[in-house]
């Protein structure tokens, strides 16, 4: 794998906004990465289920807002992020990210075994 050159993320978003539409709404920025999934994720999304990862997940909000609903000790709690906000979600904690129209964020998580990460 060749080493990728740095790029301007804001420029990438401006040039690729059309790719960030439902039903998928996300794009893996480094398909060849060995350990991490680095995604730009846009809203809106209709996800209402909770899921969890075996490892931590980093949310960095670029545009608009996101609510990350979590289950903490059996109680529902909501983490609200706006532009410039960052949140490191703990491993093995159920969560449900909800993005509205106009929401764009960077999400970084470790790859899971047997995972297809093309998009």
Regions found by a protein language model. Name each.
Residues 1-42, 47-49:
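A short, N-terminal "cap"/entry segment at the start of jelly-roll beta-barrel domains
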Residues 37, 46, 66, 75-77:
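Short acidic/polar mixed-charge low-complexity motifs
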Residues 38, 49-52, 56-61, 78-79, ...:
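His/acidic/aromatic-lined binding-pocket segments of jelly-roll/cupin-type domains
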Residues 41-42, 52-71, 105-110:
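Short, conserved beta-strand element in jelly-roll/cupin
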Residues 72-92:
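Short acidic-glycine-tyrosine-enriched beta hairpin
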Residues 91-118:
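Ligand-binding loop in jelly-roll beta-barrel domains
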